[in-house]
């Protein structure tokens, strides 16, 4: 079982190539799957990576450019053919429902499951969804059309019971949940046993930030500060910085600057322009600012 993994299905940009697939990722938190963006080829890559379709319940769309959403109709149709009956929630800017409803009416009539659209304001940093395992927040980005990234914040886990100590102090089973949540134990004689003697701290919760597509945008730094893993688009090399500015994209160096200033633990870059056959120069540029930058690739699994 994956504890908290990121699966990169595609890390190319708008123009299709034989080197990269259009953008899509799967966040796997203890076998709960959350998709970010859904470009062409997404479901084929899910097959290649042996990702279970049935465990996908939420899809987060950053913006309405085709390389981030053209894979949705096919995936939705496939889920129906696989006999899905549970609700699928699609989160994204209001335009996502306007795009998908006519497509669903034509190609996906009679689906055996419900699709619900959770429409968000991509210009604000706000809570998008939460369940027992994590909270997901929007990250306002700077692109040619309304666009947001997503911050996946794992919820704090309960402390681990030290069985030898709870047995020694004869802590009743009915009190174990309270102890896990931080309560002290009072013995029948009135002695207070501090929680720290009865439990071990759980592993600190992790956070993952996805930022694509965007121009260089320092305003996101307070939102992503200190995250365990940051995916930031790096469409262009520094020699094409003028083109990056014109198209509201980032260079690899700019992605690294954001990571450095936000003091993130690790950086992975992607969304490469089709003009580059070799991505090594992008990594080299990023490494100068943020050493150890990871060059995103299709099929890559990263532990947060």
Curated annotation (Swiss-Prot):
Keywords: Endonuclease, Hydrolase, Metal-binding, Nuclease, tRNA processing, Zinc. This is Ribonuclease Z. Zn(2+) 2 binds at residues 67-68, 213, 271. The active site is at 67 (proton acceptor). Belongs to the RNase Z family. Zinc phosphodiesterase, which displays some tRNA 3'-processing endonuclease activity. Probably involved in tRNA maturation, by removing a 3'-trailer from precursor tRNA. InterPro entries: Metallo-B-lactamas, RibonucZ/Hydroxyglut_hydro, RNase_Z/BN. Binds 2 Zn(2+) ions. Its cofactor is Zn(2+). Zn(2+) 1 binds at residues 63, 65, 143, 213. The lineage of its organism: Bacteria, Pseudomonadati, Bacteroidota, Bacteroidia, Bacteroidales. One of its GO terms (molecular function) is zinc ion binding. Its EC number is 3.1.26.11.
